[in-house]
Regions:
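Short, acidic/polar
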Residues: 161-173
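Bacterial N-terminal signal peptides that target proteins for export
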Residues: 1-9
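The substrate-binding groove and active-site-proximal loops of carbohydrate-active enzymes
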Residues: 111, 150-163
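Aromatic-lined carbohydrate-binding/catalytic grooves of carbohydrate-active enzymes
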Residues: 176-188
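Solvent-exposed loop/turn segments at secondary-structure junctions
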Residues: 114-116, 159, 187-188
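Acidic, contiguous N-terminal accessory segments
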Residues: 12-13, 20-150
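Alpha-helical scaffold elements within enzyme catalytic domains, especially in hydrolases
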Residues: 67, 172-175
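Catalytic alpha/beta active-site cores
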Residues: 150, 170, 182-184
Length: 188
């Protein structure tokens, strides 16, 4: 009797398992965000044609726009009158904190400082690359770093790196929201 009950429960578990796997959120962000609320619907990436930054963030914003072009092959016009991506400087509770909202009309990014804006763009880039350039899910993300020091060390004294390799690696660190690069240059 125990054998039949065991087989029945195993069969039931295997029957239900695929539904639970496919029903999970398939949005993968590194590092995991503090909170994400999914909404019904999507935003077509083709609608992302323009962006607006606060004036004091224009230089950093232009670098982020070039990253959109380079990594996601997405060209956007900067500081248009009716932007589809709107970056706002707002007062936040903590440094590097941001809010990213994807609506049917466009994207709203709120950050208290430029670092928060950079982290929001890293999240947006991960969403765009994960969507294979088609549709972004409607959602609201609130995020901030859990640790103030997030970094890696490269031992350049034993394993040599070219300047170009270090520049590429530094861009990857920013993409994953790391803020410290320790270069170990000599042993003495």
């Amino acid at each position: 009797m125990i054998g039949k009950s065991y087989i029945f429960h195993l069969f039931l578990f295997l029957l239900i398992l695929p539904d639970s796997i496919y029903s999970q959120d398939n949005i993968c962000l590194i590092p995991q965000v503090e909170s994400m609320v999914r909404k019904k619907g999507t935003l077509s990436i083709e609608r992302l044609e323009s962006i607006h930054f606060p004036d004091e963030w224009k230089n950093t914003g232009n670098l982020l726009v070039s990253d959109l072009k380079e990594l996601a092959n997405l060209s956007v016009m900067v500081n248009a009158s009716n932007p589809s991506i709107h970056v706002k400087k707002v007062k936040m509770q903590e440094p590097e904190m941001y809010m990213l909202e994807i609506t049917k009309q466009g994207i709203i990014i709120e950050a208290g400082d430029q670092t928060g804006m950079i982290h929001a763009f890293s999240t947006l880039l991960q969403l765009i690359l994960g969507s294979e350039g088609k549709e972004l899910p409607r959602l609201i993300i609130h995020d901030k770093p859990r640790f103030s020091y997030r970094g890696v060390m490269i031992d350049c004294s034993r394993h040599f790196w070219t300047i170009e390799q270090l520049k590429k690696y530094t861009k990857q660190l920013a993409f994953f929201k790391l803020n410290t690069l320790h270069l170990h240059l000599t042993d003495n």
